[in-house]
Amino acid sequence: NGGADNYAGIQGKLWPTGNLIKNCESFDNCDAGRNDADGFAAKLTCGEGNRFYGCISHNNIDDGWDLYAKSVSGTIGSVTIENCVAYNNGWLTTDDVTAAGYNYGEGNGFKLGGGYLKGGHKLINCVSFGNHAKGITSNSCPDISITRCTAYNNGNANSYSIGLNTMDSMLKEWKVSGLISMSKADLTAKADLIPFSQHGDDN
């Protein structure tokens, strides 16, 4: 954690597979441009079967978790994130966010994709709160699974607390069960972006 020369706290590169990251905390990660340092990054060139369990990611300048993929490098392996917490991402513990002209980082809690590519990622029994942007976002991935998760008071950047989105022309294969989203009445966040097909008695 810490330091403007750092990128992600923990990042998988060169297609690692079958790793378990357990009971770790990642915070105060920041790159020189203040827009690309995540707490945990299983993105771009990450292989199959990697898992995060019991981890906490907070106060990273970019995202708590970033599972970004892009067409140049292709799809990444399926990632499971279970019993984890993401909060207060988008600024550092040492930042004075009240200073004139302060610029937040992107600040998503759980960013679960990118590039309109499939990932099959799973978010299970996780909590996301107080993040500058979205608490949970598919970030264009069309087939993530969200089970028994809670998002609270995210979206201080006039964003969604939860956002499931991809191209209109793509088949949406999201699976959502037991998802709770709450915000304080004075928060500027937009209404959650969740397709009607995912609404139900337990969401």
Regions picked out by a protein language model, each given a short descriptive name:
Residues N1, K22, F27, K43-T45, ...:
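Feature marks extracellular polysaccharide-active and adherence modules
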Residues N83, Y116-N203:
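Predominantly extracellular beta-rich ligand-binding scaffolds that present long acidic/polar faces
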Residues N1-L14, D31-C46, N59-S73, T94-G115, ...:
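Extracellular beta-strand/beta-solenoid scaffold signature
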Residues G74-S78, N83-N88, A100, G105, ...:
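Extended non-membrane alpha-helical scaffolds
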Residues W91:
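Short, solvent-exposed beta-strand-terminating loops
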Residues P16, G47, F52, K118, ...:
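Short coil/loop residues immediately preceding or within conserved phosphate-binding loops
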Residues P16, C46-G47, I76, P142, ...:
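Small-residue (G/S/T/A) turn/hinge positions that recur once per unit in extracellular repeat modules
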